[in-house]
């Protein structure tokens, strides 16, 4: 089982074992790749910001013997948590990028990815969940289900990731596990039930009760590393019986085997209940709920046991790849760790390391061996694997090979995030790519010192390669470099990293909202050049229509070739498509990008001598401009889901402030003298809200926001944007 490390007040082994209660768990120290897939777990720790994810991960590392000392996220020793390896993370006390590690617990290997909780870094959660088999959803016992919890829940659903829930921070004033359980059921639609009950709340929390194994657990030693087993307190027995029966009923509703026992009025055994919970959790029809306090070192070891008991191993999850030749054909991955099947892996994250680009990779099939050759299915390029490492935060440990189910990292591999690699000579397949949300905010940046342009370019190139939500473009008209991202914090972190990591301080312009131009109705297009003989190679006629995309695709554009016959030679169709997408890059009424438009090409004409790709591309741009102005053009703006928490005495003031910012209140919640306001507010109206909220609530209020959707902007906003655009055009025309 491992080497037991006894750290409890320097007491001897005999003294500890002579206690009246039984010692059932300590710290386990061992580390190895275990070939048996049943003893492997790939999990992520996900939650809303400040729910205690990184603190929980620090305890997981300590109790499994992976680290010898625990450090806090904002500890007095100024060391910072192990998984927050970036200097900026330790300064700000937040997780900015996901970090991977692995531990050994009771002869099982657990790969862990600690993810950010802030919505601005949501792509880190997205790509982590894409490659994981299970997750721990951390919930604050006071805050409960919050805005980013909803986002993480959607991401888990998108990738069919089973999860167990951990209600953290039971030591805090106002902690209420029952309220959080109700929110888990009502807001997230989880079929959930408690597997544990806390022994006391707030300052009186001393341990947890396991209602399945019918035992109480207390956590002794300087750091809670010794798990002491005891009988359930007498005053909790009745509630534990009630909760156990509730648990059995909830699981019996979704598990046929336990359901049969329940209908036959047969009392299920401990092992039967655990097996039923495992089946239901893996099928995502039930969510087991654990309780504890990571900061106070309570409930973490039973949570580790829960990861082994209820979350799937790689063979219990079905992963599919798409046949590269026929993307409609799905290929089931062979998750056996024998290495007999051809290798398939997904590069899910890139990071610039000390020795070059570090590519994080999940092995889905077969074996990856050092010195072997693999093929990038996107580029068709054959590459050698010079070095394979396992990551422990920012520390690398060399390994010779990785098998199906392993998460490792490669050096010296040039690729993009989301690329699939296969064995040399094997059929080409492609893993389904990672969902990447569109940026919602932009600002202009330039280096303070013109001599830093080289470092500035290096930083920009690296960050865009690592983070698909961080976009960069050069505006030809203003001659500015424009960076775009998921929020002000997202862009602030990258500009700060330029200063810290590249010694390149930058000057930032004012943030700009990513407005979009779209159309409100269908319009026909029939465009031909004014004169066929105007210039050689300049004839091209396009006929068709443009129409609005459905609401769920409002941020996308689509080109449809509906031509019949050869009026337009097929070799000119790509030029027409290129012209359409080129025209969408800069709109006609405000200069913002065009979105939510479907371009249907129905007919056209070409000339045997005077037609060219350039002619059709320019004809398409002209046709699109004419049709766009006839199709009820309008401006879309990003709407944010906003969640405000503040003392109840400020509720009226806060609601009035949100209304002034053209927000729509969607709900409120009250708890222990505080209220939570849920609203949808245009991003354009959210600038400066943090300062206003602090002023309104005497510094006691806080808020979070995340992108929700695009909606038509208010008429006044649209008019202002169009007027500003027209004024700028006039100024340029006079120059």
Curated annotation (Swiss-Prot):
Residues 38-315 form the tr-type G domain. Residues 1-28 form a transit peptide. InterPro entries: EFG_II, EFG_III, EFG_III/V, EFG_IV, EFG_V-like, EFTu-like_2, G_TR_CS, P-loop_NTPase. SUPFAM superfamilies: EF-G C-terminal domain-like, P-loop containing nucleoside triphosphate hydrolases, Ribosomal protein S5 domain 2-like, Translation proteins. GO terms for biological process: mitochondrial translational elongation. GTP binds at residues 47-54, 114-118, 168-171. Pathway: Protein biosynthesis; polypeptide chain elongation. The keyword Hydrolase does not apply. Pfam families: EFG_C (PF00679), EFG_III (PF14492), EFG_IV (PF03764), GTP_EFTU (PF00009), GTP_EFTU_D2 (PF03144). Keywords: Elongation factor, GTP-binding, Mitochondrion, Nucleotide-binding, Protein biosynthesis, Transit peptide. The keyword Glycosyltransferase does not apply. It is found in: Mitochondrion. GO terms for cellular component: mitochondrion. Its main location: mitochondrion. GO terms for molecular function: GTP binding; GTPase activity; translation elongation factor activity. HAMAP family: EF_G_EF_2_B. Mitochondrial GTPase that catalyzes the GTP-dependent ribosomal translocation step during translation elongation. During this step, the ribosome changes from the pre-translocational (PRE) to the post-translocational (POST) state as the newly formed A-site-bound peptidyl-tRNA and P-site-bound deacylated tRNA move to the P and E sites, respectively. Catalyzes the coordinated movement of the two tRNA molecules, the mRNA and conformational changes in the ribosome. Belongs to the TRAFAC class translation factor GTPase superfamily. Classic translation factor GTPase family. EF-G/EF-2 subfamily. This is Elongation factor G, mitochondrial. It comes from Nematostella vectensis (Starlet sea anemone).
């Amino acid at each position: 089982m491992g080497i037991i490390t006894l750290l409890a007040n320097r007491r001897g082994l005999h003294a500890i074992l002579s206690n009246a209660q039984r010692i059932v768990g300590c710290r386990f120290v061992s580390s190895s790749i275990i070939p048996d897939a049943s003893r492997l777990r790939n999990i992520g720790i996900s939650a809303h910001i400040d729910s205690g994810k990184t603190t929980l991960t620090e305890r997981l590392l300590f109790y499994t013997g992976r680290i010898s000392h625990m450090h806090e996220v904002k500890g007095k020793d100024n060391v910072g948590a192990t998984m927050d390896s970036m200097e900026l993370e330790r300064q700000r006390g937040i997780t900015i990028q996901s970090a991977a590690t692995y531990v050994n617990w009771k002869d099982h290997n657990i790969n862990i990815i600690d993810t950010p909780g802030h919505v601005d870094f949501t792509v880190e959660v997205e790509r982590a969940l894409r490659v994981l088999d299970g997750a721990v959803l951390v919930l604050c016992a006071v805050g409960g289900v919050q805005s980013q919890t909803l986002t993480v829940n959607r991401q888990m659903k998108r990738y069919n990731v089973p999860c167990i829930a951990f209600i953290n921070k039971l030591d805090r004033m106002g902690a209420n596990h029952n309220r959080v359980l109700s929110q888990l059921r009502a807001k997230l639609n989880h079929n959930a039930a408690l597997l544990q009950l806390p022994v006391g709340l707030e300052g009186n929390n001393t341990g947890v009760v396991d209602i399945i194994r019918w035992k109480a657990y207390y956590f002794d030693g300087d750091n809670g590393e010794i798990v002491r087993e005891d009988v359930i307190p007498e005053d909790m027995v009745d509630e534990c019986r009630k909760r156990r029966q509730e648990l059995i009923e909830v699981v019996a509703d979704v598990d046929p085997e336990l359901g049969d026992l329940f209908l036959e009025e047969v009392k299920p055994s401990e092992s039967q209940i655990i097996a039923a919970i495992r089946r239901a959790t893996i099928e995502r029809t039930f969510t087991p709920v654990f309780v504890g306090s990571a900061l106070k070192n309570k409930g973490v070891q039973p949570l580790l046991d829960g990861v082994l008991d209820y979350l799937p191993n790689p063979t219990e999850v079905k992963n599919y790849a798409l046949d590269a030749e026929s993307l409609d054909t799905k290929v089931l991955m062979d998750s056996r760790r024998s290495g007999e099947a051809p290798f398939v892996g997904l590069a899910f994250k890139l990071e610039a390391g000390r020795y070059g680009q570090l590519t994080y990779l999940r092995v889905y099939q077969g074996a990856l061996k050092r010195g072997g050759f693999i093929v990038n299915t996107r580029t068709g390029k054959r590459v050698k694997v010079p070095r394979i490492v396992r990551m422990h935060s920012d520390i690398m440990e060399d390994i010779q090979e990785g098998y199906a189910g392993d998460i490792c990292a490669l050096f010296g591999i040039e690729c993009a995030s989301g690329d699939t690699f296969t064995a040399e000579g094997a059929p080409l397949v492609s893993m389904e790519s990672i969902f990447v949300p569109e940026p919602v905010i932009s600002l202009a940046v330039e280096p303070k010192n013109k001599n830093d342009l080289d470092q500035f370019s290096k930083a920009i190139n690296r960050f865009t390669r690592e983070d698909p939500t961080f976009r960069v473009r050069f505006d030809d008209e203003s001659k500015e470099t424009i960076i775009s991202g998921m929020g002000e914090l997202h862009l602030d972190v990258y500009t700060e990293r330029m200063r810290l990591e590249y010694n390149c301080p930058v000057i930032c312009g004012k943030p700009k909202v990513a407005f979009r131009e779209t159309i409100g109705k269908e319009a026909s297009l029939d465009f031909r050049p004014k004169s066929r003989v105007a210039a050689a190679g300049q004839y091209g006629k396009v006929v068709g229509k443009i129409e609005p995309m459905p609401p769920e695709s409002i941020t996308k554009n689509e080109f449809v070739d509906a031509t019949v016959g050869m009026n337009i030679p097929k070799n000119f169709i790509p030029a027409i498509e290129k012209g359409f997408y080129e025209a969408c890059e800069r709109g006609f009424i405000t200069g913002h990008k065009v979105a939510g438009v479907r371009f249907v090409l129905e007919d056209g004409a070409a000339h045997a001598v005077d037609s060219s790709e350039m002619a059709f591309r320019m004809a398409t741009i002209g046709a699109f401009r004419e049709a766009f102005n006839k199709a009820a053009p309008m401006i879309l703006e990003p709407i944010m889901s906003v969640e405000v928490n503040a003392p109840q005495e400020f509720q009226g003031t806060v609601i009035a402030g949100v209304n002034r910012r053209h927000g729509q209140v969607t709900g409120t919640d009250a708890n222990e003298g505080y209220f939570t306001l849920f609203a949808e507010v245009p991003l354009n109206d959210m600038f400066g809200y943090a300062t206003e909220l602090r002023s309104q609530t005497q510094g006691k209020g806080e808020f979070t926001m995340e992108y929700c959707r695009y909606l038509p902007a208010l008429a006044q906003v649209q008019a202002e944007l169009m007027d500003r655009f027209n004024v700028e055009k006039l100024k340029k025309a006079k120059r």
